[in-house]
Amino acid sequence: MKRLASTAMLVMIVGLLFLPGCGYNAIQGKDEEVKATWAEVENQYRRRYDLIPNLVRVVQAYAKHERETLIGVTEARSKVGQLKIGQDVINNPEQFRKFQQAQGDLTTALSRLMVVVERYPVLKANENFRDLQSQLEGTENRITVARKRYIDAVMEYNKLVRYFPTNLTARFLLHVEVRPTFEAGDEKVKQAPEVKFE
């Protein structure tokens, strides 16, 4: 009995010595980093979403014959608006895929709109349009930066969740899994649209 108690005590002491290396705090820290970078991605996409109605109104005033393109942008924006966005998206690969697809469709629709605008020199000279175009360019750049930061944060988090010994803590203690990230193969989402007016 004494031997069993001393063996149990030895196992507990050895276990306590290795506990700091289990990665619990590291996983928690990386999880918070992923959430923070995701919030920034959401924030930038929301900014773009909010710019679109004003952009469509200005283009609509000058390009009345481009109804199909304007409807395409409005419908793509509507699909993005119907998505449930929040921290749950980064925990659910299917929701993340839908989010990514909707944002990609909106990017494509905006690109088509900018091609249409090229046919209307008076519109390109409009001060309101130039301001909106500048804001859209800046937002697209911020989206690219926010996505890159998110991808980097998810990569670091996923390493912790997959590598030994932190994978044991992730699986058995925290019950967490790898997080989804933007797919590099989806060109229309990976690259910001070229928006130039001269």
Region locations from a protein language model:
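A helix-centric hydrophobic-segment signal that preferentially recognizes long
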Residues: K2-E198
